[in-house]
Amino acid sequence: MLYDKSLERDNCGFGLIAHIEGEPSHKVVRTAIHALARMQHRGAILADGKTGDGCGLLLQKPDRFFRIVAQERGWRLAKNYAVGMLFLNKDPELAAAARRIVEEELQRETLSIVGWRDVPTNEGVLGEIALSSLPRIEQIFVNAPAGWRPRDMERRLFIARRRIEKRLEADKDFYVCSLSNLVNIYKGLCMPTDLPRFYLDLADLRLESAICLFHQRFSTNTVPRWPLAQPFRYLAHNGEINTITGNRQWARARTYKFQTPLIPDLHDAAPFVNETGSDSSSMDNMLELLLAGGMDIIRAMRLLVPPAWQNNPDMDPELRAFFDFNSMHMEPWDGPAGIVMSDGRFAACNLDRNGLRPARYVITKDKLITCASEVGIWDYQPDEVVEKGRVGPGELMVIDTRSGRILHSAETDDDLKSRHPYKEWMEKNVRRLVPFEDLPDEEVGSRELDDDTLASYQKQFNYSAEELDSVIRVLGENGQEAVGSMGDDTPFAVLSSQPRIIYDYFRQQFAQVTNPPIDPLREAHVMSLATSIGREMNVFCEAEGQAHRLSFKSPILLYSDFKQLTTMKEEHYRADTLDITFDVTKTTLEATVKELCDKAEKMVRSGTVLLVLSDRNIAKDRLPVPAPMAVGAIQTRLVDQSLRCDANIIVETASARDPHHFAVLLGFGATAIYPYLAYETLGRLVDTHAIAKDYRTVMLNYRNGINKGLYKIMSKMGISTIASYRCSKLFEAVGLHDDVVGLCFQGAVSRIGGASFEDFQQDLLNLSKRAWLARKPISQGGLLKYVHGGEYHAYNPDVVRTLQQAVQSGEYSDYQEYAKLVNERPATTLRDLLAITPGENAVNIADVEPASELFKRFDTAAMSIGALSPEAHEALAEAMNSIGGNSNSGEGGEDPARYGTNKVSRIKQVASGRFGVTPAYLVNADVIQIKVAQGAKPGEGGQLPGDKVTPYIAKLRYSVPGVTLISPPPHHDIYSIEDLAQLIFDLKQVNPKAMISVKLVSEPGVGTIATGVAKAYADLITIAGYDGGTGASPLSSVKYAGCPWELGLVETQQALVANGLRHKIRLQVDGGLKTGVDIIKAAILGAESFGFGTGPMVALGCKYLRICHLNNCATGVATQDDKLRKNHYHGLPFKVTNYFEFIARETRELMAQLGVTRLVDLIGRTDLLKELDGFTAKQQKLALSKLLETAEPHPGKALYCTENNPPFDNGLLNAQLLQQAKPFVDERQSKTFWFDIRNTDRSVGASLSGYIAQTHGDQGLAADPIKAYFNGTAGQSFGVWNAGGVELYLTGDANDYVGKGMAGGLIAIRPPVGSAFRSHEASIIGNTCLYGATGGRLYAAGRAGERFGVRNSGAITVVEGIGDNGCEYMTGGIVCILGKTGVNFGAGMTGGFAYVLDESGDFRKRVNPELVEVLSVDALAIHEEHLRGLITEHVQHTGSQRGEEILANWSTFATKFALVKPKSSDVKALLGHRSRSAAELRVQAQ
């Protein structure tokens, strides 16, 4: 099957509690359990209502408790002893065998066995699912010989455990939770509240600890396993390690480099890192190795999860040298990571460089510190608190229970940098290439190939005229990728009858739901392409000789870089060239690849450090080995032979020219790449004046363009550094034979077989025959746009013409002509190789369900108003409403005038930009679709060119006319599966009647993700294929990201069925659907609903010219140009209804032939499809049988949606507030209410706002507000979607997403009276507050977290400090900050403005200056008064001491405020044009 049950992803809630001075108590344990219960909403509950996905505790070894246990049994425990917590097999014989092996290996280490203990448990509290997999749970007590130190024992326990695990590898139920003399772990598949009821030890008051880590898991699987509950042996992790495949690969490659005198037999423990299963456990493995090798927990975590140090100009040079030195020994383990860890002495919390997980801490007077995903997870009195804060991006907070100190990053880093003279070592030993920009002209390089030879090389490497003009020229001229529109409607490489280069067979993987893409445009400060080459050394040995490296800023080499590299004199950098061409008359491609591996191995053994793979030596009979094949095969060989870390793979190739090509080479092991033919080609374009720039500029532009493309590809997967991306193999090989994958691309996902070595050799031969014939011109191409005689396009002119003829005439016979062209086309998609086999029991068409029932299953795909003209957008809505289907608003909002009419879009999309998302928008929806990814460009945000942002479009999107709008790549409130569950909860609270849909894009593992989405209580999942359309997207995204929906749909169907969830969720497919045949095939493969994008647009008149992004659509469909819309748009709704009527008719005819009366009865009927043999040699090697496999349904459960998916949390406080306020809302009466609140009360205010928006609109109750006062800690999304007329006052603090999507009203948050801390130094609200807000006011007397005001489009706010990336993508509103800000302030800010207090005078350094400028407020009198008025209101609403201090010393503070505004804004107009700013313009009484 395509669905792999072993693939599991998880996210969670996590935390730690510790007594700072190390005093053990049962209170610490009890508080940790209480905290876990308060984060139950961050986990998942399975169908039996009692089984969780896993939770657990890691505590200091409870010495007093264990000594009592031993005494009761008559055991004598030595001064130094260990306790192992083991899961054993239920089978008594296997359990006995495991005990015997455990004892043998421990005794081999001269450790003496004290005894075994059955851990007291109460199975009655477990659910059926947990009970069915419950292992035997036992503890083993072990004494150390006299004189052993605890760390010595810990190291020998590590070696013993690894030997035990290797001997018991076949017993899948055996698992060592912990085997340590420092810490102990209790974990399992119960609910958090049941943990002490299951493990009776935890309820025993004698069990004490000064440290306790806790973890609540949310898995994408409904059959979770006991061992995967966390914590692991040292850490608990919330997030996902995006780089895990590369980290595991490098851990294996470095095995021979790990050496330490502390463990002479360390290699007995290899492999050190598990290569399958949980990413968190792999990181725990590596941390354990580093600690065993003598590293302390602080250096180990700074090595694994370093901050973003490369682009920090203010970093201390000594500290920079420390991180630089470390980077030479290990790549970052990168991805969303909130990590808590402990070795028994230290307890620590570490955050990833992007700050993608929340970590809030509270310190109380009794010396307890809690740090967790949320604040408010245990109940303390306000006057007990001495400090509140958060761990920020890249920060490490350490509690040293021995010295009784809390160490923040500044202190730990000060210690680390001073341990060795890193700066001196680096300056003395690291070589750096002379930058291309600094070289004299004669060293820049020039063309080496004459025109004829250049043409031959271009033809051999399959260049096309189209590629020269649309890809290479654009990169050289503009320094960035070309943008295109529409989707990819050409055949996959393996289906094509044209020769295609091997790069075309690889599809980029991308992050969705369980981890986010990151933002290479606005958050580039965390990203780096910096590359070091040389021999790697032993990470456990810090010495000057380990700093011999040669460093440069990008792995893409220019001529001068390559020359410098290959002419180094030192032995450290010895370079030798390996020719990767072969004589086709004497050998084969496959044999050559194997021979290259042999040669490479021999060269590295003989001392080669820079292994240069070159394909320059081609000739008539000499063909190039495709560079990725050579790189991948040699990488695997060198890793297997323990040689990879002594060599670097440099690729001198003609084959790489666009960013995807370089990403493939790097992803499979290349260290650096010299694309000589791309430079030769650009040189000719300069010589022929096709590019009117000098050679140096063009080469630099090209490399900058490739660098940007690499950043984008890495960021799609959430990866920040090239070191972590290298060897990560984050591609699916679609259409490669297993032999090719096995030899060259080991570890890449490949599911359907395909092209063999022989096929590639034949392609190379065919290209060679053409290459050396001077009269044969370079190919015209046709991959990007239709070219007569070139690559087949599914929307070729004939298809477009016949479809438009059919919808205009309304004649079914015309449609049949169109359908014949589509259904009998050359194999273009995988489904084209699956034929429908008519059944023997045909039925009368009158018995088939009517077209009106099918129409309910048809949606038009999301296309925004802005991308489409208003007329086209409304026509789609009218058409779908008239037949009972659904149109989708897309991500650009919708005109409220359309609500309640036949022009309303019944599906409202919520995308990452949140354009126009208000409570009224959401309540006027039957379906709310969360667009996690888009088929044409997964991992990227939407894009609307400035020419299309007219005043009308800007009004709908709450933005500035004429300014390009780019959505962030991630939803900033979805960094994990539990974040998605929270957004679904937010939406269900505001509009309980709407179905919540989640749009995913097909990729390997999408079934696993879809299972998690279903567990997050979505109602509908859309699986989009790579061939979906787009209004504007980089060309490499359109061509190389996303996979066929056939693979994604089948995997998702199999996953949902296998996990017993399919009957609870609807499954939709979209991407390239054109005819009734597509509907039938998609239904058989699992879909019960269908999305159409391009087809309806073509029906409206689109001619598929691919110029949507230029705003000059010739038919007025995809333009905002008044003249084009008025003179050329003829798209009436009847054309769209005709199209769907034709599809429904064809579908019903096919159903009748198949003997099926209801569409849902087709689902899973794969017997009605048969695999065709294929029409080309490559097609014939495809293995599509996995598409026809079905999962075994759970008894009594359907293969399609038959019931609802209600969440366990119904939002009781929300319901209470709405019930009490409803009569007053109906009567438009103001009323005040009071409530207590806790962190489990989430999305408070959403239900009330939804009801107000439904009855009175977004602002209809603003004059008669409902006021609610709360006391305590608010859960996530306090005040989400706040409508005008809702005023929320909170005394206490709040978690993430405060005021998200608020449209009006007021939120005011103040600390409790009598708080001991200063408000502006304490965190009061969490991350991503005011995300997508369009109005209203937020006042908070304290600090906010990361990404405050991201995509703020109109809210006015005052807070007292924020984290990194503040006001990112802001298009409107006013933000006032009375304290410190983090870095990257104002990135992508195109509207609104901000006031920032800059007491230390360094704020300007933390501003992203690309689009904004910083002015002094004291030079702007009206702004000074306006600011003063805002602060006065802040004080009135929150009683802010900070605000009072500033007002009382106004003359001093006024000079310290900066005003940040977009460069495109006129400072004089910032206040004047804002009618809703009138209140702030009052000059307040002083």
UniProtKB/Swiss-Prot annotation:
One of its GO terms (biological process) is ammonia assimilation cycle. Pathway: Amino-acid biosynthesis; L-glutamate biosynthesis via GLT pathway; L-glutamate from 2-oxoglutarate and L-glutamine (NADP(+) route): step 1/1; Energy metabolism; nitrogen metabolism. FMN binds at residues 1049-1101. One of its GO terms (cellular component) is cytosol. InterPro entries: Aldolase_TIM (IPR013785), ET-N_metabolism_enzyme (IPR050711), GATase_2_dom (IPR017932), Glu_synth_asu_C (IPR002489), Glu_synth_asu_C_sf (IPR036485), Glu_synth_centr_N (IPR006982), Glu_synthdom (IPR002932), Ntn_hydrolases_N (IPR029055). The keyword DNA repair does not apply. Its cofactor is [3Fe-4S] cluster; FAD; FMN. The active site is at C12. Pfam families: GATase_2 (PF00310), Glu_syn_central (PF04898), Glu_synthase (PF01645), GXGXG (PF01493). GO terms for molecular function: 3 iron, 4 sulfur cluster binding; glutamate synthase (NADPH) activity; glutamate synthase activity; metal ion binding. Binds 1 [3Fe-4S] cluster. PROSITE patterns: GATASE_TYPE_2 (PS51278). [3Fe-4S] cluster binds at C1102, C1108, C1113. Coiled coil: none annotated. Disulfide bonds: none annotated. It catalyses: 2 L-glutamate + NADP(+) = L-glutamine + 2-oxoglutarate + NADPH + H(+). Residues 1-11 form a propeptide. Residues 12-402 form the Glutamine amidotransferase type-2 domain. Aggregate of 4 catalytic active heterodimers, consisting of a large and a small subunit. Belongs to the glutamate synthase family. Catalyzes the conversion of L-glutamine and 2-oxoglutarate into two molecules of L-glutamate. This is Glutamate synthase [NADPH] large chain. It comes from Escherichia coli (strain K12).
